[in-house]
Amino acid sequence: MSLNVAILGCGNMGSFITKAIVNGEAGDITLHTLIGTQRSIKKLEQLAELANCKWTTDPGTLEIDEVDLIIEAAGQQAVKDHMLSYLEKGKHIMIISIGALAEREVYEKVLELSKKSGGQVILPSGAIGGLDAIRSAAIGGLETVELITRKPPNALKGAPYVIEKGINLENLQAEIEIFHGNALDAAKAFPENINVAAALSLAGIGPERTQVTIAASPSLTRNTHEIRAKGACGEYSFKFENNVSPENPKSSHLAVLSILSALKEFQRTVLF
């Protein structure tokens, strides 16, 4: 039986998911509704025509009883403004902007609503892997978890933290560290760049204790993430050197593919 899906957001990520569903790359899925904004109405109409689905610019008008799963692809604020409401009504939701869950109040609300409504919350692994090992090690006890992210300067331009601090990423001759702090602060400072920090922290020891370092490196052509963890079960390190997403230079190609993987996993009867 086909899974009826709605997508909130028709930017780079929403467009990618829409086209993947149309091409049959996400499993047995029917796209029921696309939700966009007035600013993106032309693109919204084009995508809806491609997918032969309904569209709206008002998230509150979604025919929720006809949808099995709602995918967020509209940013952290959309998680707070709309996805919690869908979850409260018992709908399964997928959150791509995982950085929103680094805020303790938001994460606790998601847990509360999920338990009450029965709605499942799906979090794609994004541009990293090894989260299964981190989850397992956390049960035994983790002392430290660290994420070191290095990206080409262009991938970090426009981030709120870069603008706020007046960091000049033009014509860099050498790698510079532009952020060091915990995953909670990283998710707020780089909402479009560092969802992996939130995902890692939720799998492990929490946003406040997960340490994050972000560097801009002019010699890189790939987005690089290195995870280091230490605990009662041992020491672990993972390194990912990801090609940039063709759809979004601020993200990795692996990140968008992880969404398709999560959609397929949701439809499976045998789970890894």
Please provide the spans of the model-predicted regions.
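Extreme N-terminal starter segment of soluble prokaryotic enzymes
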Residues: 1-6
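Rossmann-fold NAD(P)-binding glycine/threonine-rich loop
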Residues: 98-119
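NAD(P)-binding Rossmann-fold cofactor-contacting core
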Residues: 26-47
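A short helix->loop->beta-strand "cap" motif at the edges of active sites that frequently abuts
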Residues: 53, 89-92, 116-119
